[in-house]
Amino acid sequence: DSAHIQEQEAEWKNRKAMRSGAEMIEPDYTVEDAQNVMKQFVPCPYETWQTLFDGPTGKIEMRFTDVGHLLGSASVSLRIAEPGRTPEIIVFSGDIGNTHQPLIKDPSNPGHADYLVMESTYGDRSHGPKPDYIGDLSAVLQSTFDKGGNVVIPSFAVGRTQELLYFIRQIKAEGRIKGHENFPVFVDSPLASKSTTIFRENFAECYDDEALALVQSGRNPLQFPGLHVSETKEESMAINGDPTPKVIISAAGMCDAGRIRHHLKYNLWRPECTVLFVGEPVQVKARIAQLGGLSGHADKDGLEAWLRAFDEKPKFVFVNHGEDAVAEHWANHLKEEGYEADAPYNGSIWIAAEGRVACAEVGNTRKIIKTKSAETVRTSAAYDRLANMGQRLLEVIRHNQGGANKDLAKFASQIAALCDKWDR
């Protein structure tokens, strides 16, 4: 899906480039590239050790554990054995899922870790009380349909779309929407359609007890009367031609690509319509609503519960995958709780063996000036190199001052094409 979006954007930019005489661009990768990469994938079940290397210098094994973030998400355990040493396990948490979410199981713990690399996305906050998803969504649907409008929901194709279908099935089954009982629901995203099929095919391994109970009673948690899936561009464009109040679920969830932009174009100007975000509101004429609490990430309490489930404390916890301040906050919190922990900088090198941990290289740090204070932030070596190239480009521009207008125009067009390619 990402490759398809890149191909579409390249096609659109190249049409503009042909009119202006600018240099043509190529997508970073194509659908064919993605399909070729998929041939290299090897499916692995949860909780099964897979041998990655076995030779005279040692043995490395890998195991996936369901971490409850998305369908198929996993933490990764690496068991490393070297001659003359006790085998040790390093665990990479990945994104740790939220608990008590619809459809998929709660996150599991790998059981043992000598060294842990742990995410910290929400390491400084709690999600608060669980919202009434069904009640909140029902209220949005009822008020919008009563005004004759559509409910447009920008949604991630994997995970979020399926959760919404799960809620809407229950809303319809309980007859919560009065006067619009047969309201249609359109899922307008080829990737969301494929993802929903994968959810249905893997219910035995991935569904939680509540969703499994529905399946065992003969009900599909993701199917209900009035559900329509749009595959073709023509089917997508026809959705807004029908005046019937409806739900439109479409990707991308951030509204920066995909078919959702078409639906926003046709509904944002209509005050009777509602755009339902699981994110930040936008000031437009259509009513903007927010359905809170639908987070795939564990909060501070969830991270702590997952960490405490190990059979014994890891010898060291490396904190990553969070905003700088949050990662530092979570690492300090772990230290207060008696863990050996650190939030390393990008590019840092650590040596861990037989329970001993040492930092060999600190990594990349730099100071940035904010309005009130200076703060140390992490920056990658790749970004530093990119910034240096930007300075070099300015020097080259200055060196070309006084050059032929034709050459300067060509140079400017090349820079504009490069900016258009990466400014997205």
What are these regions (language model features)?
Residues 70, 94-96, 120-121, 156-158, ...:
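Active-site metal-binding loops of divalent metal-dependent hydrolases
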Residues 60-64, 198-206, 304-306, 354-365:
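Short, surface-exposed amphipathic charged segments that create phosphate/polyanion-binding patches used
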Residues 1-163, 169-184, 206-209:
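His/Asp/Glu-rich metal-coordinating catalytic cores
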Residues 271, 322-367:
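C-terminal, active-site-flanking charged/polar segments
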Residues 143, 347-410:
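Charged, amphipathic alpha-helical linkers/stalks
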Residues 281-307:
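Generic long, charged, amphipathic alpha-helical segments
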Residues 140-279, 311, 326-328, 332-337, ...:
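Hard-cation-handling environments
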Residues 96, 129-134, 225-235, 253-256, ...:
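A general structural motif
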